[in-house]
Regions:
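Structured C-terminal cores of nucleic-acid metabolism proteins
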Residues: 1-198
C-alpha cells in the first residue's frame, strides 16, 4: 500500500535535516524518485534509502489484489520456493486449484498477525544475543552510526553488525553520524546496551 502522507512528509523533513534539499512532489512515487535523485548527488544513497524504507507501509497479506506499491506493480503476489511458510503453501494451493478458499480473509489476517509476532520474537532473540555479546566485551570500542536522534540510539557497523546501543553522552549529533563508542553496560534481561561516545 502507498505510504501515508504523514510518513512521506516526515521523510522529506528528515532528508532536509541531513542537508539534502528536497520537496514534496505531486505524488508519492515522484517524491521518492526526487529524493533518490538528490541522494545520488549528495552521495548519501545508503542513508537516505534507509529513511525511504522506514517510510513505507508495513506489508500485509490480503485477499484482494492490492498490487505492490514499492515495486510499482498493479498486480502482485509472492511466495518462496521451496515453500517455507504457511502463506506460501496457501498461495501455491490457490494457484494450483484456481479456487480461492471461502475463509481467505481470515487466513490472510491470521498469517499477517502471526508473521508480526514471529518478527518480534526474532528481534527479541537477536537483541538478547547482542546484549550477551556486549556483556562479554564491556570497555571495548566499537564503531556506530546514529539511527535515532530523538532516543539517542546508534547501530554498530563493525565487529557485531546491527547491534543497537543507547548513547549515554549524546549531544545531538546528526542522523547517520559515525563515531567510536565504548561499551559501558549491557543487560541481557532488558536487552539494553549503553555506550559512551569517545
Amino acid at each position: 500500500e502507498e505510504p501515508a502522507f504523514k510518513a512521506i512528509s516526515k521523510l522529506v523533513d528528515d532528508v532536509n535535516i541531513l542537508g539534502v534539499n528536497v520537496k514534496l512532489q505531486s505524488d508519492v512515487h515522484d517524491t521518492i524518485t526526487h529524493i533518490q535523485e538528490k541522494a545520488k548527488i549528495s552521495m548519501m544513497n545508503a542513508e537516505i534509502d534507509e529513511l525511504i524504507i522506514q517510510a513505507q507501509t508495513q506489508a500485509k497479506y490480503s485477499s484482494k489484489n492490492l498490487g505492490h506499491f514499492g515495486l510499482g506493480f498493479s498486480s502482485y503476489s509472492h511466495f518462496t520456493s521451496p515453500i517455507r511458510r504457511y502463506s506460501d503453501l496457501v498461495l501455491h494451493r490457490i494457484l494450483k486449484t484456481k479456487q480461492t478458499p471461502k475463509n481467505i480473509e481470515d487466513i490472510c489476517e491470521h498469517i499477517s498477525l502471526n508473521e508480526r509476532k514471529i518478527d518480534q520474537l526474532v528481534w527479541d532473540f537477536e537483541d538478547r544475543k547482542y546484549a550477551r555479546w556486549a556483556s562479554l566485551h564491556l570497555g571495548e570500542e566499537i564503531k556506530v552510526k546514529v539511527v535515532d536522534t530523538e532516543k539517542a540510539k546508534a547501530v554498530c557497523y563493525e565487529k557485531i553488525f546491527g547491534m543497537k546501543v543507547n548513547l549515554e553522552n549524546y549531544k545531538g549529533q546528526k542522523l547517520f553520524s559515525k563515531m567510536r563508542v565504548k561499551i559501558k553496560s549491557a543487560d541481557i534481561v532488558t536487552k539494553v546496551i549503553v555506550a559512551t561516545i569517545m
